[in-house]
Swiss-Prot record:
CDD domains: S1_YloQ_GTPase, YjeQ_EngC. Its EC number is 3.6.1.-. Its cofactor is Zn(2+). PROSITE patterns: ENGC_GTPASE, G_CP. HAMAP family: GTPase_RsgA (MF_01820). One of its GO terms (cellular component) is cytoplasm. It comes from Paraburkholderia phymatum (strain DSM 17167 / CIP 108236 / LMG 21445 / STM815) (Burkholderia phymatum). Binds 1 zinc ion per subunit. GTP binds at residues 136-139, 190-198. This is Small ribosomal subunit biogenesis GTPase RsgA. Belongs to the TRAFAC class YlqF/YawG GTPase family. RsgA subfamily. The keyword Metal-binding applies. GO terms for biological process: ribosomal small subunit biogenesis. One of its GO terms (molecular function) is GTPase activity.
Length: 317
């Protein structure tokens, strides 16, 4: 019979568990199921969060305790540089953590949503991520002039727009994209039909094999993009994180103060408003509204700001 007290036994057990903990990188997420790649390069395994709440994201560095050869429990999330997510009145949807940049995939056709583009840019600015806009399918010549015209506003704001034809000119597209992606952790966002999956397959030759491996580990049986997953970029320290296509991008969690600073064209004017607590909606002496009136700020950009402020006001904080 052990001579140690129950308290000492509990401490010893906790110490044993701590010694069993392994560092890893979350490379896929689907619901409360996560795939973790161990730091030592051993086989990936399925992990679950400890407790009911789960705030784990792809790109997180974690500590987990193995519970079997291919499963474990995540017990700690490492310090994050950032966390990108979207939210509505009721819930949040995590995209990824520890990012450097955001790659927003658009196409000449089908018609892309400028509202979603604008929201993605705001999210990037608020998280201090570099946004890259990719215009795909430039070989569809009839639709190209209108797409370019719609993106002129964003070029004028200083955003990088990369024009590619992933299917028509794959080698040129690969060279263009790799020049901007290598060495960086990049989240890929886009509506369905824009060519996001084609882009992944272009840059990650074994993407389909990796997807099947993760699907098997998640026991999902599905080989479509129903989960967010991270791919190491071949020959680079960078990573590409692919997320499911989406049709909404709520930013209800952003306060008015964060929103005004997420519009780069607003920033130089914020100190010029007559009132220090100006909302930039209908106040007299508002430098932002004056810039909208004389064309220095696009009306559609201010309309997006006003809509986001309205949405944020619906949240009880």
């Amino acid at each position: 019979m052990s001579g140690r007290s129950p308290k000492a036994l509990r401490a010893a057990t906790a110490n044993d568990r701590a010694q069993d903990r392994v560092r890893g990188l979350v490379i896929a997420a689907h619901g409360r199921h996560y795939i973790v790649a161990p730091e030592d390069g051993s086989a990936i395994l399925q992990c679950f969060p400890r407790g009911k709440r789960s705030e784990i994201a792809v790109g997180d560095q974690v500590l987990y305790e193995p519970t079997s050869a291919d499963q474990g429990v995540i017990v700690e999330i490492g310090e994050r540089r950032n966390l990108l997510y979207r939210s509505d009145q009721y819930k949040s949807k995590l995209f990824a953590a520890n990012l450097d940049q955001l790659l927003i995939v658009l196409a000449t056709e089908p018609h892309f949503s400028e509202d979603l583009l604008g929201r993605a840019l705001v999210a990037a600015e608020e998280n201090e991520l570099k946004p890259l806009i990719v215009l795909n399918k430039i070989d569809v010549e009839a639709a190209l002039p209108l797409a370019r015209k719609r993106l002129q506003l964003y070029r004028g704001l200083g955003y990088t727009v990369l024009e590619v034809s992933i299917k028509g000119q794959p080698d040129a597209a690969r060279a263009t994209l790799e020049a901007h992606l290598n060495g960086h952790s990049t989240l890929l966002l886009g509506q369905s039909g824009m060519g996001k999956s084609t882009l992944v397959n272009l840059l990650i030759p074994d993407a389909e094999v990796a997807t099947r491996e993760i699907s098997t580990a998640l026991n999902s049986g599905r080989h479509t993009t129903t989960f967010t997953r991270l791919y190491p970029l071949p020959g680079s320290e960078g990573a590409l994180i692919d997320s499911p296509g989406f049709q909404e991008f709520g930013l209800h969690h952003l306060t008015e103060g964060k929103l005004e600073r997420a519009f780069p064209e607003f920033r130089p004017l914020l100190a010029e408003c007559r009132f220090y607590n100006c909302h930039h909606l209908h106040e007299p002496g508002c430098a932002i509204l004056e810039a909208v009136a004389d064309g220095r700020i696009a009306k559609e950009r201010h309309a997006l700001y006003a809509q986001l402020v309205h949405e944020a006001s619906q949240i009880v904080r």
